[in-house]
Amino acid sequence: MTTTVGIAVKDGVVLATDKRVTAGYYIAHKRGEKIWKIDDHVAATMSGGVADLQSVLSFLTLRAHEYKIEYKRPIPISALVNYMSLILFYSRPYIYIVHSIIGGVDEEEGAVLYMVDWLGTVTKEKYIATGSGSPYAKGALEVGYREDMTLEDAVDLAIKAVKAAIRNDPGSGEGIDVVVITRKEGFKRVFTTQQKLVLPSL
């Protein structure tokens, strides 16, 4: 259970997540990092089984580095997404419990955002939310998204979307992480906050 959000605009991609890590309704960790840097130009959010995600995203990171060494340029994001889809599809009947947003900026497509589910299904999106808090986050995205959004507007909207999920979903909480990926600066963490526990007066 979690909330992850992705928004693609002209100048780059924004990825945002909450920080609560759960096992069912047990809160296992309060400072989880759910945005995985694959390479300087691309990253993925983590929703689902942590061990499965770490395994699959490690493969993607290795493939991205191999591609850069072999071809002397960053891997196209569509190729990376197709590689992940093949891993998930051909792992059947064993299923990796993963649901990931992959976003970044490349020479082929500019700022681009994909969603990949545990069966290997791939969809290209302008904005998307995954995880148990996604109905609340998606509502905020539907209301706030505009085609002409600036990167700063997209960061603000991503934060609002994750906050909406945290307010309503017991599987999301503890704080927010936001990453921006642009052509000029690449992968950059731009916002993080940790919720403080406030005890009632006794």
Curated annotation (Swiss-Prot):
Query: Which InterPro entries does its entry note?
Result: Ntn_hydrolases_N, Pept_T1A_Psome_bsu_arc, Pept_T1A_subB, Proteasome_bsu_CS, Proteasome_sua/b, Proteasome_suB-type
* Chief location bin: cytoplasm
Q: Which residues form a coiled coil?
A: none
Its GO biological process annotations read: proteasome-mediated ubiquitin-dependent protein catabolic process
One GO CC annotation, please?
proteasome core complex, beta-subunit complex
- Reactions this protein catalyses: Cleavage of peptide bonds with very broad specificity
- Keywords carried by this UniProt record: Autocatalytic cleavage, Cytoplasm, Hydrolase, Protease, Proteasome, Threonine protease, Zymogen
Q: How does it assemble?
A: The 20S proteasome core is composed of 14 alpha and 14 beta subunits that assemble into four stacked heptameric rings, resulting in a barrel-shaped structure. The two inner rings, each composed of seven catalytic beta subunits, are sandwiched by two outer rings, each composed of seven alpha subunits. The catalytic chamber with the active sites is on the inside of the barrel. Has a gated structure, the ends of the cylinder being occluded by the N-termini of the alpha-subunits. Is capped at one or both ends by the proteasome regulatory ATPase, PAN.
Task: Tell me the protein's name.
Answer: Proteasome subunit beta 1
Query: Taxonomic lineage of this organism?
Result: Archaea, Thermoproteota, Thermoprotei, Thermoproteales, Thermoproteaceae
Gene name in the database record: psmB1
